[in-house]
């Protein structure tokens, strides 16, 4: 009776798992599945019916855990389509498994050694030249639970990877990689992994764990197909297919280079020169900017460089605009030579300005001599008067009024003229104005 009840209930709970169990393997006192030889045909008939029912049933039945039965092999995850994802955020593990997002939502599924839970490796993109079973991503595996206190050098994640993060868009072309990697780095920062991303100097704050490395590795493959990567990225991954951090580090360096290119273009477009600095310094500055752009595969023609330089000239250098306005064949070296010539001329003029002023002041002292004389007395007269000096008429008036004869005939003294004549005779006589005696 007991065996009949077991045979009736077995299709519901165990299914075809009876095919792997024999009466010899299971003792009679431990497992009720042991049946007698007389019931074997009935058991075979029941199992055949169960198998036929399972083939027609679309879904799979849940099998209870039993250590006597053979465990089923894990189902392989189908590769995702490299197109635009319709999801707008990270999902739970159950939904991720159903929607092919499990390869980066649960990085531990990409297990490559004995301490992982699943032996299967999922390769999302057939264009990646990777083996089906890859070696471990790091040389040192995580320590067992009992030995974690003994080894403290193993890097540990400080924060848990954040869920519900907007993923980056899928890379569509090789030319858009520099733009795509910016969104990918932002995606990692929003996932609490910003401290393991290299900065502008190529430095990182901490070492990433194995799980974080697998997470970065899988997300990079999921959103960046191998055949759309630039050549320099392919060369890095061909040497070490999991070295995503090197790709990110060089990408950040290239971003800095692109920023420098933008700064150089802005500096070249806003050039100004008025002679305040030397012409050699100005030429070195412009030549350095042009050479730096040339190293980044950006060639600046002489005509464009001359136009940008002429636009910023002012002062004594401004007239070069009219000179080069009608020129079709502009040479940058010729323009620098003319700027240097004007700068040198202005420098010489500035050095000669003090000596010219001194010579001009010496010529202001005028000498007057009387004609037809051999021995002359020179009267030097300075035309520059001080503020305290008075006109000649005022001086004559003061002398006349201050004389002791001013009370007698003041009007007569004022009307008298003062003159001096110089005679060239032997006695050198000089005639003086006559005065009346009272």
UniProtKB/Swiss-Prot annotation:
Assembly behavior: Homotrimer.
Pfam family, one: TYA
Comp. bias (Low complexity): 369-381
Residues annotated as site: Cleavage: 397-398
Residue ranges of the TM segments: none
Remarks, miscellaneous: Retrotransposons are mobile genetic entities that are able to replicate via an RNA intermediate and a reverse transcription step. In contrast to retroviruses, retrotransposons are non-infectious, lack an envelope and remain intracellular. Ty2 retrotransposons belong to the copia elements (pseudoviridae).
InterPro entries membership: TYA (IPR015820)
Subcellular location: Cytoplasm
Residue numbers spanned by region Disordered: 1-88, 366-397
Record comment regarding domains: The C-terminal RNA-binding region of CA is sufficient for all its nucleocapsid-like chaperone activities.
Job description of the protein: Capsid protein (CA) is the structural component of the virus-like particle (VLP), forming the shell that encapsulates the retrotransposons dimeric RNA genome. The particles are assembled from trimer-clustered units and there are holes in the capsid shells that allow for the diffusion of macromolecules. CA also has nucleocapsid-like chaperone activity, promoting primer tRNA(i)-Met annealing to the multipartite primer-binding site (PBS), dimerization of Ty2 RNA and initiation of reverse transcription.
Gene Ontology molecular function, alphabetical: RNA binding
Domain of life assignment: Eukaryota
Composition bias type Polar residues, residue spans: 1-39, 49-60
Gene: TY2A-OR1
Name the UniProt record assigns to this protein: Transposon Ty2-OR1 Gag polyprotein
GO BP terms in the entry: viral translational frameshifting
GO cellular component, one term: cytoplasm
Major location (coarse): cytoplasm
Chain spans, region RNA-binding: 295-397
């Amino acid at each position: 009776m007991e065996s009949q009840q077991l045979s009736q209930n077995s299709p519901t709970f165990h299914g075809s798992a009876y095919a792997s169990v024999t009466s010899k393997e299971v003792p009679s006192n431990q497992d009720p599945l042991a049946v007698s030889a007389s019931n074997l045909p009935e058991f075979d008939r029941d199992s055949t019916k169960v198998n036929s029912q399972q083939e027609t049933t679309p879904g799979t039945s849940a099998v209870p855990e039993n250590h006597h039965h053979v465990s089923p092999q894990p189902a392989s995850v189908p590769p995702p389509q490299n197109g635009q994802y319709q999801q707008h955020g990270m999902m739970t593990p159950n939904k991720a498994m159903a929607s092919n997002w499990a390869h980066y939502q649960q990085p531990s599924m990409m297990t490559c050694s004995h301490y992982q839970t699943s032996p299967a490796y999922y390769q999302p993109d057939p264009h990646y030249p990777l083996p089906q079973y890859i070696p471990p991503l790091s040389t040192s595996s995580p320590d067992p639970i009992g030995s974690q206190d003994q080894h403290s050098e193993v890097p540990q994640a400080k924060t848990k990877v954040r869920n519900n993060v907007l993923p980056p868009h899928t890379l569509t072309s090789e030319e858009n990689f520099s733009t795509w990697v910016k969104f990918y780095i932002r995606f990692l920062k929003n996932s609490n992994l910003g401290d393991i991303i290299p900065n502008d100097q190529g430095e990182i704050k901490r070492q990433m764990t194995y799980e974080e490395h697998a997470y970065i590795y899988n997300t990079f493959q999921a959103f960046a197909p191998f055949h759309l990567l630039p050549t320099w990225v392919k060369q890095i991954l061909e040497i070490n297919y999991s070295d995503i951090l090197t790709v990110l580090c060089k990408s950040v360096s290239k971003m800095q280079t692109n920023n420098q290119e933008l700064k150089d273009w802005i500096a070249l477009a806003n050039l100004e020169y008025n002679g305040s600095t030397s012409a050699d310094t100005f030429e070195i500055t412009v030549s350095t900017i042009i050479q730096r752009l040339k190293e980044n595969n950006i060639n600046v023609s002489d005509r464009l460089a001359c136009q940008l330089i002429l636009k910023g000239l002012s002062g004594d250098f401004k007239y070069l605009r009219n000179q080069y306005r009608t020129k079709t064949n502009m040479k940058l070296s010729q323009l620098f030579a003319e700027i240097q010539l004007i700068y040198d001329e202005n420098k010489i003029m500035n050095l000669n300005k003090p000596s010219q002023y001194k010579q001009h002041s010496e010529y202001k002292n005028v000498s007057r001599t009387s004609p037809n004389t051999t021995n002359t007395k020179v009267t030097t007269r300075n035309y520059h008067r001080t503020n305290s000096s008075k006109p000649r008429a005022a001086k004559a008036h003061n002398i006349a009024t201050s004389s002791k004869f001013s009370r007698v005939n003041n009007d007569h003294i004022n009307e008298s003229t003062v003159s001096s004549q110089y005679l060239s005779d032997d006695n050198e006589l000089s005639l003086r104005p006559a005065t009346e005696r009272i």
